[in-house]
Regions:
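Short beta-alpha junction loops
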Residues: 98-116
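Conserved beta-strand segments of the P-loop GTPase G domain that flank and frequently precede/overlap
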Residues: 7, 69-73, 102-104
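C-terminal interaction surface of TIR/SEFIR-family domains
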Residues: 3, 48, 110-184
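A short acidic (Asp/Glu
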Residues: 16-18, 79-83, 111-115
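Conserved N-terminal substructure of TIR/SEFIR domains
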Residues: 1-66, 163-184
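Conserved TIR/SEFIR loop-to-helix hotspot centered on a Trp-containing motif
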Residues: 74-90
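Short acidic, S/G/P-rich loop/turn micro-motifs used as interaction or catalytic elements
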Residues: 11-15, 74-77, 108-110
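Arginine/glycine-rich "motif VI" loop of SF2 helicases in the C-terminal RecA-like domain
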Residues: 89-98
């Protein structure tokens, strides 16, 4: 059974995360690794960038096969999302990189319809989606919600892609939260 980590920024998005968790549990589709913002309290300003990412990999993502990122209006501005993405992209000891699924939430699709700008994404994700050597799965919440079996297809696809993807991880780790959208 796949191990899945679901990243969401705010309490407003928790309902989407809970829906995915319930669906996964009911269908026996995946096991989850959980976290909340307090789980990141072990990190402090004395940690180096590498220590932060490795700690997130070891203590938060653990042995996840796939990471699902719920993308809302504030997601790109959050440092913890940046850390989770970077930790999802690295191999560290026996812990391998994760397949990545991006789910655009209704607050994004309602505003932008089908022409979602890359600026809604965290920078590290934007750069890797644009990289032909990376295979990141994208979908919308509406599609997952309407199409039975869509999530299972996405999980299987992301799992296949994880070993093919050559993520590029820059040194621009986010050390504090920033404004709403990235400007590249």
């Amino acid at each position: 059974m796949k191990k899945v980590y679901i990243s969401c920024y705010s309490n407003e998005h928790q309902k989407y995360k809970n829906t995915l968790l319930d669906y996964g549990k009911n269908k026996k589709l995946f096991l989850t690794n959980f976290s909340n913002e307090k789980d990141f309290d072990f990190l402090n300003t004395n940690n180096t960038d590498d220590e932060i990412i490795k700690s997130v990999k070891l203590k938060i993502l653990k042995d996840s096969d796939v990471s699902i990122f719920l993308i809302g209006k504030e997601t790109s501005s959050r440092k913890i999302i940046d850390w989770e993405l970077r930790a999802s992209m690295i191999n560290y000891g026996v812990l391998k990189n994760c397949g990545i699924i991006v789910v655009y939430l209704p607050e994004i699709t309602d505003e932008f319809k089908e022409k979602i700008p890359r600026s809604v994404l965290p920078e590290i994700l934007y750069k890797n989606i644009s990289n032909p050597d990376c295979h990141i799965v994208e979908t919308t919440w509406n599609r997952i919600n309407k199409e039975v079996g869509h999530l299972e297809k996405l999980l299987n696809l992301a799992l296949c892609y994880k070993d093919l993807s050559k993520y590029k991880i820059d040194k621009n780790i986010k050390i504090k939260n920033s404004s709403k959208y990235n400007m590249f």
